[in-house]
UniProtKB/Swiss-Prot annotation:
<comment type="function">
    <text>Catalyzes the acyloin condensation reaction between C atoms 2 and 3 of pyruvate and glyceraldehyde 3-phosphate to yield 1-deoxy-D-xylulose-5-phosphate (DXP).</text>
</comment>
<keyword id="KW-0786">Thiamine pyrophosphate</keyword>
<dbReference type="InterPro" id="IPR020826">
    <property type="entry name" value="Transketolase_BS"/>
</dbReference>
<protein>
    <recommendedName>
        <fullName>1-deoxy-D-xylulose-5-phosphate synthase</fullName>
        <ecNumber>2.2.1.7</ecNumber>
    </recommendedName>
</protein>
<dbReference type="GO" id="GO:0030976">
    <property type="term" value="F:thiamine pyrophosphate binding"/>
</dbReference>
<dbReference type="GO" id="GO:0016114">
    <property type="term" value="P:terpenoid biosynthetic process"/>
</dbReference>
<feature type="binding site">
    <location>
        <position position="78"/>
    </location>
    <ligand>
        <name>thiamine diphosphate</name>
    </ligand>
</feature>
<feature type="binding site">
    <location>
        <position position="179"/>
    </location>
    <ligand>
        <name>Mg(2+)</name>
    </ligand>
</feature>
<keyword id="KW-0784">Thiamine biosynthesis</keyword>
<dbReference type="InterPro" id="IPR009014">
    <property type="entry name" value="Transketo_C/PFOR_II"/>
</dbReference>
<dbReference type="GO" id="GO:0008661">
    <property type="term" value="F:1-deoxy-D-xylulose-5-phosphate synthase activity"/>
</dbReference>
<dbReference type="InterPro" id="IPR049557">
    <property type="entry name" value="Transketolase_CS"/>
</dbReference>
<dbReference type="Pfam" id="PF02780">
    <property type="entry name" value="Transketolase_C"/>
</dbReference>
<dbReference type="Pfam" id="PF02779">
    <property type="entry name" value="Transket_pyr"/>
</dbReference>
<feature type="binding site">
    <location>
        <position position="288"/>
    </location>
    <ligand>
        <name>thiamine diphosphate</name>
    </ligand>
</feature>
<dbReference type="GO" id="GO:0009228">
    <property type="term" value="P:thiamine biosynthetic process"/>
</dbReference>
<dbReference type="GO" id="GO:0019682">
    <property type="term" value="P:glyceraldehyde-3-phosphate metabolic process"/>
</dbReference>
Amino acid sequence: MSRPSTPLLDKAPTPDRLRALPEQDLPQLAEELRTELIDAVSTTGGHLGAGLGVVELTVALHHVFNTPYDRIIWDVGHQAYPHKILTGRRDRIRTLRQAGGLSGFTKRAESEYDPFGAAHSSTSISAGLGMAVASELSGEKRNVIAVIGDGSMSAGMAYEAMNNAGALDARLIVILNDNDMSIAPPTGAMSAYLARLVSGRTYRSVREAAKQVAQKLPKFLQDKARKSEEYARAFFTGGTLFEELGFYYVGPIDGHNLDHLLPVLKNVRDTQKGPVLIHVVTQKGKGYAPAEAAADKYHGVNKFDVITGKQAKPPANAPSYTKIFGTSLIEEARHDDKIVAVTAAMPTGTGLDLFGEAFPKRVFDVGIAEQHAVTFAAGLASEGYKPFCAIYSTFLQRGYDQVVHDVSIQNLPVRFPIDRAGLVGADGPTHAGSFDTGFLAALPGFVVMAASDEAELRHMVRTAAEYDEGPISFRYPRGDGVGVDLPERGSVLEIGKGRIVREGTKVALLSFGTRLQECLAAAEELGAAGLSTTVADARFAKPLDHDLIRRLAREHEVLVMVEEGAVGGFSSHVLQFLATDGLLDRGLKVRALMLPDIYQDHGKPDAMYAEAGLDRTGIVRTVFAALHRDELGHEALPTPFRA
């Protein structure tokens, strides 16, 4: 299929070339950029809706500001694909999120036009403020622009940064990309005129002069003058909250109208004083009918047909782990009216949309606010409820202090379903669930579980629902299950007890999580090589099954631990127990397989696990090496002594 014709975009491969174009050409450039974006993402998959919504804004920013000297920071980075196309990466845009290709987010190592990496939300204003202060300290006249969506503004970190920026009176431009307004975008000449007026140098100079005069008045008159001015501006614009934080507010303006965007951005650029917030109203999926009609379904997409918008979905061999969690929790909630669910702006991603349909009054979406979500759940637990605080592994990191201080120290029975455990493929290191086992198993009294398949996940949901002695977590990966038979309802597992899945005599493979299937495949291959192999499912990283570990250590020559986590997790706890229990004293050969001590780049999960040695081949190779055998399983001949 031929690529779309983009004659203007072809002339603007970098921002300096873009800035050479006359303003009257920019609307056509934006349309070509939108066409290129749709065509590229249709072949790669990725985040489409957010990028379509900021096409005109991206063109305007790079036309008005002197990037990369001026810094543009994209919060989260979902919307940065148009930015990548315009900043010298168009020739690689069809490698998005592929192994060895472009990242799906901004990335410092990828381009000088990406001054700050992003993927988690609400960091842009803090980073931008740091850059703005650094520029001032260095005597630079650099503009720093943070582009943040209204969803990211639900996180407290954004307001902490704005409060600090206002107090410092820093030269920082924040663009609030509001794509979720319940009213239509502002239209007409009056709206555009007001935005130009309040962003202009004359208005702001008069306003500053009036402030200086007002400071000489009695305080009660100062307050009245300030409130009158705020009321008058808020009548047209509505920026009182941001003004209270010390920002000069401009907007709202139509983010798809370059005739409105360009003069406002120029005015703000040319006025070198204090922090400014520009409120821009956009539409997710703008310019592509299927995405406009169903913005939620086109936030993140698989490959799709550009004409019909139909997404390609590979056939599922089994329900996803996320769906199994959601349906299992519904089943438990039918038996226990104390069960409630908490999510931090990810009801669909965590499967709690299903729970919400069944129990709308027992699910709470707190927004992008993981810290609040954890302590909110702790409050529910303190009153006798059974909160399931479902958060992706990577996002639980944001609420770790609350996990320690508000949940663990008080031993409150908050349940933590941890989705996206292990590698997540195309989203790369920013979204990998590598660290939760380590940072949760370090906490006294915390029960830490990992499901090896979808049936085990159902058992762990039931176990967590029944467990009231303290905090408990269970982790499970992204993607489909392995296709095992599912019980109608899970069983309650004995805390701290694993299970033997396959009996052997020489080699023991102890798995924590869904690498169990690879361990079973490795056991078959090892058996064919004459190495009788036991496979065990640990189930618990804390408390460990000491009896199971003793048996594996005493009855086998080789013990290999296998997990989908970073250094310091399950294997570390097993090794500590082996050492303190004296089980290493008799010459047991112990090996630990885990994620490498690097941030693995994006790629296909299977290939990434193979790279880490966490597939069947890697496990077999590890056992052979421990027994001094070659890759065919033959005993290696001793190296002859040479004088």
